[in-house]
Amino acid sequence: KGTEIDHAYFIDPDKVLYISNPSAYDGNFKDIEVSCPVILDCTYVSSTNIQRIDVPTNTGQVFFSFSKGFGLIGQRLGLVYTKKPHPTLDLLKQFENWNYGGVKTIELVMKNFAVDEMWNKHKEKQIEICNDYNFTVSDCFFLATTKDPFYRRRRRMKADDTARVCTSILFKQGII
């Protein structure tokens, strides 16, 4: 889960900032530039259309997940790109200590699905759900936002009355 930058006064310029883009806060892409070191979490990329991602210049690592967009929840499959060797991951690589089955699954997903395939398949349903429930559409096909007080427990930021709502249950139940 990335730290959101809507509250820039919380950022310590000497500490690494974890940022999710698209944002874990609302599932939308953000233009981001901060002066501290950054680890960029692109977990939601496979649940959006293809867009240019703003990568802060001082980003040291970028993560991608196959869990959310491709429905591989619990598999813990992802990729990490680093500017410098990662101390722990580099050591594991030297001993060939990684999940070969997971690597094969990632390879199969990448060969058989476009990165925006799930977004293209489900975007119209997301729009229908958002219209029916008076939600605001997110860049991620299974997320929406609302300021409806009923959803106050879903708020991700105490200083904001916007709630992030996962709409995937409505897909599963065939409500729409």
Task: Identify the residue ranges that each predicted region occupies.
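PLP-dependent class I/II
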Residues: 1-176
